[in-house]
């Protein structure tokens, strides 16, 4: 049987039609040298600054130094499996991370990969990690309170939604405790008002894994993990991960800001990010400057913190609040990184070792701490009671230093010292016990209106506990009225509050 020519051509045509061209074009380079988490690569002529590249075995890296004859790449992972001569592929993508509600309740690394063993993350979109901050036109001045639940902070150093407030102090002074209490305090507000929810992001930079695990456990126990994402670049992670984590977390939080929602981000702490960046820069042979930090270390933090903002109505009224943490050495706030971050932020909370060891916790130095947003981030009732307490504590500090020299003090000075000692005692607060706005107003009002003057200093804590228990049970109406009405505390409102506290004071013994 002879094969027909037409048949052959039909078969060939069919084969050609179904031929799939599987050839892929990729721009590749070769590793010249590798070590200390840095790879020098030759041949990636068109690579962009900040572009993600891929090494054999799926290890990722980011191109940071674009030089004439080679590219300096930082490696997001172990450099042990990379050797000289390995091929490096361009991905044609800038470093991006997943974003959306699917991240809430999860623990992720600096690239947004889950590390909590709860399966893959369902993300609505991907966002570039390092983007430009919003301009001047979309912004609005800060005017809504972001309550921390801490008496000393909410009354004297108020934080608003969209503000950047630095928490600064030596190691072991309670910086993370303030940040953690702020996250825990949002639970009651989020439950009461789901439409105005505050989504929290906690970035752990260069911390021990055990510390991060403890923190996550605490958040889960308190039911706060449902609105929180933890981004962890721990001490055992490479420096590029510690450098990238804050930017990645900010990109995740910006999803909420840009969609008319509210987010809070805590960077714990930025001193370690600066150290990681210094390490990378020196290994990339960039010229060192003051304290061996590179010349652009100010820009490192300014471009990060400028992304926290309050947007106006035309842009959805969303907000992103930042609480960066900086660790000082021996109380030296005039070092390079602390002064940089102080100048970028809208205020700072100073924590002092001395106060901490005196038992004043949170160890906030109310004289040096400041909020540059001020009372515009406070409710009416809080504004009314915060003014007098600030003044009285300032006078007390001045007089206390003075009173050490003389013993014969006049009655007015003695009264001022007594009141100041009680107010200082009143500002103490145990960890994990945030108070609502109304409760803080009632407690501080009691302190500034003489209800504590006859109470011994040691009994102030017991008085406060008793007063809060009384208001929560017998006089719920007062707390509800303060929350709903938010009155200015004067005239009838002042009388109503005074009467309620006086009722309790009679029973206190």
From Swiss-Prot:
It is found in: Cellular chromatophore membrane. The gene is atpA. It catalyses: ATP + H2O + 4 H(+)(in) = ADP + phosphate + 5 H(+)(out). Produces ATP from ADP in the presence of a proton gradient across the membrane. The alpha chain is a regulatory subunit. InterPro entries: ATP_synth_asu-like_sf, ATP_synth_asu_C, ATP_synth_asu_C_sf, ATP_synth_F1_a_nt-bd_dom, ATP_synth_F1_asu, ATPase_a/bsu_AS, ATPase_F1/V1/A1_a/bsu_N, ATPase_F1/V1/A1_a/bsu_N_sf. ATP binds at residues 169-176. Its EC number is 7.1.2.2. NCBIfam families: atpA, PRK13343.1. Pfam families: ATP-synt_ab (PF00006), ATP-synt_ab_C (PF00306), ATP-synt_ab_N (PF02874). One of its GO terms (cellular component) is proton-transporting ATP synthase complex. F-type ATPases have 2 components, CF(1) - the catalytic core - and CF(0) - the membrane proton channel. CF(1) has five subunits: alpha(3), beta(3), gamma(1), delta(1), epsilon(1). CF(0) has four main subunits: a(1), b(1), b'(1) and c(9-12). Belongs to the ATPase alpha/beta chains family. Keywords: ATP synthesis, ATP-binding, CF(1), Hydrogen ion transport, Ion transport, Membrane, Nucleotide-binding, Translocase, Transport. It is an enzyme of class 7 (translocase). One of its GO terms (molecular function) is ADP binding. This is ATP synthase subunit alpha. It comes from Rhodobacter capsulatus (Rhodopseudomonas capsulata). It is a peripheral membrane protein. The record marks 369 as: Required for activity.
């Amino acid at each position: 049987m002879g094969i027909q020519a037409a048949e052959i051509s039909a078969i060939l045509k069919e084969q050609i039609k179904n031929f799939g061209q599987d050839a892929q074009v990729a721009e590749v380079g070769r590793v010249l040298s590798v070590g200390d988490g840095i790879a020098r690569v030759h041949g990636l002529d068109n690579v962009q600054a900040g572009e993600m590249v891929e090494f054999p075995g799926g290890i990722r890296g980011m191109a940071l130094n674009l030089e004439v004859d080679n590219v300096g790449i930082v490696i997001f992972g172990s450099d042990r499996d990379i050797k000289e001569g390995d091929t490096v592929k361009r991905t044609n993508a800038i470093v991006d991370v997943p974003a959306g509600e699917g991240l809430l309740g999860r623990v992720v690394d600096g690239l947004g990969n889950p590390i909590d063993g709860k399966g893959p993350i369902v993300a609505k979109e991907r966002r570039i990690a390092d983007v430009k901050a919003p301009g001047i036109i979309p912004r609005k001045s800060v005017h809504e309170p972001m309550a921390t639940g801490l008496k000393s902070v909410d009354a004297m150093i108020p934080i608003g939604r969209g503000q950047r407030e630095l928490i600064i102090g030596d190691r072991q002074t309670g910086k993370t405790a303030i940040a953690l209490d702020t996250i825990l305090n949002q639970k009651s507000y989020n439950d009461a008002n789901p439409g105005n929810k505050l989504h929290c992001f906690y970035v752990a930079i260069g911390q021990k894994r055990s510390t991060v695990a403890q923190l996550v456990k605490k958040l889960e126990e308190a039911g706060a993990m449902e609105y929180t994402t933890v981004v962890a670049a721990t001490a055992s992670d490479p420096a590029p991960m510690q450098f990238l984590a804050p930017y990645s977390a900010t990109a995740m939080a910006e999803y909420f800001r840009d969609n008319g929602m509210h987010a809070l981000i805590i960077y714990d702490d930025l001193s370690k990010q600066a150290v990681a960046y210094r390490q990378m820069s020196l290994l990339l042979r960039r010229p060192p400057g003051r304290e061996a930090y590179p010349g652009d270390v100010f820009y490192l933090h300014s471009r990060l913190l400028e992304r926290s903002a309050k947007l106006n109505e035309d842009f959805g009224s969303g907000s992103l609040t930042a609480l960066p943490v900086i660790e000082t050495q021996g109380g030296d706030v005039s070092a390079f990184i602390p002064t940089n971050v102080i100048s970028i932020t809208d205020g700072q909370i100073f924590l002092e070792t001395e106060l901490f060891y005196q038992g004043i916790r949170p160890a906030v130095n109310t004289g040096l701490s400041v909020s540059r947003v001020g009372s515009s981030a406070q409710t009416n009732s809080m504004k009314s009671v915060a003014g007098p307490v600030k003044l009285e504590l300032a006078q007390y500090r001045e007089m206390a230093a003075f009173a050490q020299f003389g013993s014969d003090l006049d009655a007015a000075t003695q009264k001022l010292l007594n009141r100041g000692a009680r107010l200082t005692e009143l500002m103490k607060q145990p960890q994990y016990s945030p108070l609502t706005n109304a409760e803080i107003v009632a407690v501080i009002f009691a302190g500034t209106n003489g209800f504590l003057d006859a109470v011994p200093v040691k009994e102030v804590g017991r008085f406060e506990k008793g007063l809060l228990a009384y208001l929560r049970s017998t006089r719920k109406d007062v707390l509800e009225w303060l929350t709903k009405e938010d009155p200015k505390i004067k005239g009838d409102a002042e009388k109503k509050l005074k009467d309620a506290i006086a009722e309790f004071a009679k029973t206190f013994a």
